[in-house]
Amino acid sequence: MVHMSAEEKGIVTSMWGKVNVDDIGAEALGRLLVVYPWTQRFFDSFGDLSSPAAIMGNPKVKAHGKKVAHSISDGIKNLDNLKGTYAKLSELHCDKLHVDPENFRLLGNVLVCVLARNLGKEFTPHARTAFQKMVLEVAAALAHKYH
Protein backbone atom coordinates (compact mmCIF):
# COMPACT_ATOMS: atom_id res chain seq x y z
CA MET A 1 0.00 0.00 0.00
CA VAL A 2 1.05 3.53 -0.66
CA HIS A 3 0.84 6.27 1.91
CA MET A 4 -0.92 9.52 1.12
CA SER A 5 0.19 12.53 3.12
CA ALA A 6 -2.32 15.00 4.51
CA GLU A 7 -1.17 17.45 1.84
CA GLU A 8 -1.80 14.91 -0.94
CA LYS A 9 -5.25 14.12 0.45
CA GLY A 10 -5.99 17.84 0.43
CA ILE A 11 -4.83 18.18 -3.18
CA VAL A 12 -7.02 15.27 -4.29
CA THR A 13 -10.06 16.62 -2.45
CA SER A 14 -9.57 20.16 -3.74
CA MET A 15 -8.91 19.24 -7.36
CA TRP A 16 -11.72 16.67 -7.51
CA GLY A 17 -14.06 19.48 -6.50
CA LYS A 18 -13.05 21.42 -9.63
CA VAL A 19 -14.14 18.82 -12.18
CA ASN A 20 -17.51 17.78 -13.49
CA VAL A 21 -17.63 14.35 -11.88
CA ASP A 22 -20.27 13.01 -14.29
CA ASP A 23 -18.25 14.01 -17.36
CA ILE A 24 -14.95 12.76 -15.92
CA GLY A 25 -16.47 9.37 -15.11
CA ALA A 26 -18.11 8.95 -18.50
CA GLU A 27 -14.91 9.88 -20.31
CA ALA A 28 -12.72 7.65 -18.15
CA LEU A 29 -14.90 4.55 -18.55
CA GLY A 30 -15.26 5.19 -22.27
CA ARG A 31 -11.51 5.54 -22.71
CA LEU A 32 -10.92 2.37 -20.67
CA LEU A 33 -13.19 0.42 -23.04
CA VAL A 34 -11.45 1.90 -26.10
CA VAL A 35 -7.84 1.52 -24.94
CA TYR A 36 -8.33 -1.88 -23.26
CA PRO A 37 -10.97 -3.55 -25.47
CA TRP A 38 -10.88 -6.81 -23.51
CA THR A 39 -12.63 -4.95 -20.66
CA GLN A 40 -15.71 -4.70 -22.89
CA ARG A 41 -16.65 -8.28 -22.03
CA PHE A 42 -17.99 -7.07 -18.68
CA PHE A 43 -20.40 -4.73 -20.46
CA ASP A 44 -22.18 -7.01 -22.94
CA SER A 45 -25.54 -5.51 -22.02
CA PHE A 46 -24.42 -2.00 -22.98
CA GLY A 47 -25.19 -2.42 -26.68
CA ASP A 48 -22.96 -0.99 -29.40
CA LEU A 49 -19.29 -0.96 -28.38
CA SER A 50 -18.04 -1.53 -31.93
CA SER A 51 -15.92 1.60 -32.34
CA PRO A 52 -14.41 4.40 -30.27
CA ALA A 53 -17.19 6.76 -31.42
CA ALA A 54 -19.88 4.23 -30.50
CA ILE A 55 -18.33 3.67 -27.07
CA MET A 56 -17.85 7.34 -26.25
CA GLY A 57 -21.40 8.15 -27.36
CA ASN A 58 -23.03 5.14 -25.69
CA PRO A 59 -25.55 6.32 -23.05
CA LYS A 60 -25.05 3.19 -20.93
CA VAL A 61 -21.28 3.74 -20.86
CA LYS A 62 -21.86 7.36 -19.84
CA ALA A 63 -24.35 6.38 -17.12
CA HIS A 64 -22.08 3.71 -15.66
CA GLY A 65 -19.09 6.06 -15.87
CA LYS A 66 -21.04 8.58 -13.80
CA LYS A 67 -21.79 5.86 -11.26
CA VAL A 68 -18.10 4.93 -11.10
CA ALA A 69 -17.05 8.57 -10.66
CA HIS A 70 -19.55 9.10 -7.85
CA SER A 71 -18.10 6.02 -6.17
CA ILE A 72 -14.66 7.64 -6.50
CA SER A 73 -16.17 10.74 -4.86
CA ASP A 74 -17.27 8.55 -1.94
CA GLY A 75 -13.73 7.24 -1.65
CA ILE A 76 -12.26 10.74 -1.71
CA LYS A 77 -14.56 11.66 1.18
CA ASN A 78 -13.28 8.60 3.08
CA LEU A 79 -9.59 8.37 2.18
CA ASP A 80 -8.77 7.01 5.62
CA ASN A 81 -11.23 4.11 5.28
CA LEU A 82 -11.16 2.99 1.67
CA LYS A 83 -11.46 -0.72 2.49
CA GLY A 84 -14.64 -0.04 4.43
CA THR A 85 -15.96 2.33 1.80
CA TYR A 86 -15.48 -0.20 -0.99
CA ALA A 87 -16.17 -3.46 0.89
CA LYS A 88 -19.54 -4.11 -0.78
CA LEU A 89 -18.29 -3.13 -4.23
CA SER A 90 -15.26 -5.37 -3.78
CA GLU A 91 -17.49 -8.29 -2.89
CA LEU A 92 -19.81 -7.60 -5.85
CA HIS A 93 -16.98 -7.36 -8.36
CA CYS A 94 -15.22 -10.43 -6.95
CA ASP A 95 -18.03 -12.85 -6.16
CA LYS A 96 -20.75 -11.94 -8.65
CA LEU A 97 -19.19 -10.08 -11.57
CA HIS A 98 -15.81 -11.88 -11.54
CA VAL A 99 -13.95 -8.78 -12.69
CA ASP A 100 -10.19 -9.14 -12.94
CA PRO A 101 -8.87 -6.81 -10.21
CA GLU A 102 -6.17 -5.55 -12.61
CA ASN A 103 -8.98 -3.66 -14.35
CA PHE A 104 -9.33 -1.40 -11.30
CA ARG A 105 -5.72 -0.30 -11.71
CA LEU A 106 -6.21 0.24 -15.43
CA LEU A 107 -9.28 2.39 -14.83
CA GLY A 108 -7.37 4.39 -12.23
CA ASN A 109 -4.58 5.10 -14.69
CA VAL A 110 -7.09 6.17 -17.34
CA LEU A 111 -8.80 8.41 -14.78
CA VAL A 112 -5.49 10.15 -14.02
CA CYS A 113 -5.00 10.80 -17.76
CA VAL A 114 -8.54 12.17 -18.10
CA LEU A 115 -7.99 14.45 -15.12
CA ALA A 116 -4.75 15.72 -16.66
CA ARG A 117 -6.53 16.45 -19.93
CA ASN A 118 -9.37 18.27 -18.20
CA LEU A 119 -7.38 20.22 -15.62
CA GLY A 120 -4.50 21.22 -17.88
CA LYS A 121 -1.62 23.13 -16.28
CA GLU A 122 -3.37 23.00 -12.92
CA PHE A 123 -2.69 19.25 -12.88
CA THR A 124 0.90 19.62 -11.72
CA PRO A 125 3.34 16.73 -11.25
CA HIS A 126 2.60 16.90 -7.51
CA ALA A 127 -1.15 16.66 -8.19
CA ARG A 128 -0.56 13.74 -10.56
CA THR A 129 1.41 11.93 -7.87
CA ALA A 130 -1.34 12.52 -5.32
CA PHE A 131 -4.03 11.21 -7.69
CA GLN A 132 -1.89 8.25 -8.72
CA LYS A 133 -1.54 7.27 -5.08
CA MET A 134 -5.29 7.69 -4.56
CA VAL A 135 -6.27 5.50 -7.51
CA LEU A 136 -3.79 2.82 -6.38
CA GLU A 137 -5.37 2.88 -2.92
CA VAL A 138 -8.88 2.66 -4.41
CA ALA A 139 -7.82 -0.22 -6.67
CA ALA A 140 -6.34 -2.06 -3.68
CA ALA A 141 -9.53 -1.52 -1.68
CA LEU A 142 -11.67 -2.81 -4.55
CA ALA A 143 -9.41 -5.85 -4.89
CA HIS A 144 -9.51 -6.54 -1.14
CA LYS A 145 -12.06 -9.41 -1.34
CA TYR A 146 -9.92 -11.16 -3.95
CA HIS A 147 -7.18 -11.90 -1.42
From Swiss-Prot:
Pfam families tied to this protein: Globin
Modified residues (S-nitrosocysteine): C94
Range of residues in the leader sequence: none
Superkingdom of origin: Eukaryota
Modified sites of kind N-acetylvaline: V2
A GO term from the CC aspect: haptoglobin-hemoglobin complex
Molecular function in Gene Ontology: haptoglobin binding; heme binding; hemoglobin alpha binding; metal ion binding; organic acid binding; oxygen binding; oxygen carrier activity; peroxidase activity
UniProt similarity note: Belongs to the globin family.
Function: Involved in oxygen transport from the lung to the various peripheral tissues.
Listed name of the protein: Hemoglobin subunit beta
The organism of origin for this protein: Scalopus aquaticus (Eastern mole)
Lineage of origin: Eukaryota, Metazoa, Chordata, Craniata, Vertebrata
